[in-house]
Amino acid sequence: SETFDKFCTILFKKALEKEIAAIGITDYFSIDNYKKVKAFISNIDTSTDFTKEEIITVKRILIIPNVELRILPVTDSGRLVNVHCLFNPAYEDSLENNFFGSIEYSAGLGKKYKMNRQGLIDLGKSLDSSLNNEKAYIKGVDSFVVTHSALQKLLDENSGFRENVIIAVSNSNRDGASAFQKHYDLFEDAKESSLDAVRKSIYCISNCI
């Protein structure tokens, strides 16, 4: 789409056509696009692309912030496991402190970077000091990974976070937890490999697959 508003217009026209009641707005390590979609809806009364009836219906659609994480370890296909965190929209204001500011990426040598915008910028610049903030942010997003233990710790220690998130894991054999199953070929006599334990631990923190 030429602009984000044009994208939103196409998105909601299709949602109206398909009678969709809820939409998850996905971002890696942020809810920036979710906020943009909410802003579009806030200003939809001035849009000439929708009828009054369509505007009423669009405002009734549940918009959900969906943060996608890349989880270690790497799968058999060389990909990180993709995990989606779908949040209660009412929890939005708490995400910066309780989620993005709570998970860290360890780069070794005592260097840690938070999963918030500044942390991602700092990570990007640590990899390429010539980058400006915007390009460093993109570099940081491309490089940041989350460990299963970090997400598990957050779920264990923060009941407010736990009560306001639904965690979904892909079951794909490329970037999902099922990709670990291919490693069984390396353990001919083993009934249960350590990678099976990893797969099960990822499933245990997930609410849906």
For each feature predicted by the language model, list its residue ranges.
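A metal-dependent hydrolase metal-coordination microenvironment
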Residues: S1-S126, S130
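Domain-core and long-helix interface of multi-subunit machines
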Residues: S1-T9, K13, E19, A39-N43, ...
